[in-house]
Amino acid sequence: MNEFFDTIVVGGGQAGLSVSWHLKQIGREHIVLDRGRVGDTWRRRWDTFCLVTPNQYCQLPGFPYDGDEPKGFMLRDQIVDYLERYAKSFEPPYRGGVEVRRLGPSKNGGRFSLETSEGVLGAENVIVAAGTHQHPNVPAWGSKLAGDIVQLHSRDYRNPAQLPDGAVLVVGSGQSGCQIVEDLSAAGREMHLSVGSAGRIPRRYRGRDIIEWLEATGFYELPVDEHPAGRAIRFRAHPHLSGRDGGRTIDLRRLAVNGVRLHGRVIDANGCQLDLADDLVKNLDAIDEACSEGLVKIDGSIAENDIDAPENDLESVDWQPTKESATLDLMQAGINSVIYGTGFRFDFGWIDLPVFDDRGYPRYERGVTEVPGLYFVGLHWLHTWGSGLFYQVGRDAKHVVDLL
């Protein structure tokens, strides 16, 4: 074994850095291993990417946002700069360019052995902060598309100039899909969107940014086990909204009014022909209903706590599909490019320890696993909605560090 550490943190993004900050506060020996460099996950986003939560909610431990636009939304390069400055502010024991290929029990002292691209390391504790974006989730039917159709996952999309002339189909209506539709529409592209079940929330409501209301009404404090969906919420897409140009609501019906062609889910493909599910109306109605239910809860909290707020001034968009087609002919529609906003698949196969459920997702209680010394931090809804966000990832990091 080349080296041994009390604690090894796997992953050097906002979660791993937050853990390192707390470890340094108590003088705990550790090292942070990252396969890339600080900010790489964000560095790979498209050119106009921005946060959808206001800058004031960037609250990494010891490094709250201190810029001039607390209610603005940092762009991609600003996010990278924020993380780089964070790392410089406390100088974590960070090793970039190191891939952890296997984590398992140790046979040579200590609890764990980590096989890395730079040799074997040992540790008494391991905190996994590597996220769940290991592999792009591309539908199986993509392999059946005609060879001259350009296909990109949102991970690989950068700007409209990447794509050939012609219309574009975006598959998936979560945050990435809808924001890429925004980007391409602004560039004058004719857009088609295959709508899924991801919800929406308005950018502003009753005089405040919606994120401020979610905080004020206690949503950020809601433990995952008290969410109506339970732990299944961990695998659902974030509701769509935008921070672009100062922030705005993304309403799929309004996109349609503005010229975006909406379609049901794509269920199969053959060359240039796509088979569509008969679910566009159902999904649009469900999205609207879920949004309305959320706003009713905010209204109730405003009334219950006697909060001074203006009345609801949201304008509803009265648009309905004229006819749901069972197919979409890409050639006939002039579509030469397909972009998948279909999220990612997690892959914890490199962890050779008995802590996973039937789908390969780790079992834990607020990041604490059944294996002594093994923890997870930074996962979506690990404990609350903020667990995977700049705002509250530090709380879970502290919780885990306090248990070491």
Residue ranges and their predicted role:
Residues 70-74:
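Leloir-type glycosyltransferase catalytic cores
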Residues 2-12, 18-40, 48, 75-404:
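Flavin (primarily FAD) cofactor-binding/catalytic cores of flavoenzymes
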Residues 61-68, 377-383:
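Short glycine/proline-rich turn/loop motifs
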Residues 37-64, 255:
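Redox-cofactor-proximal catalytic regions of oxidoreductases
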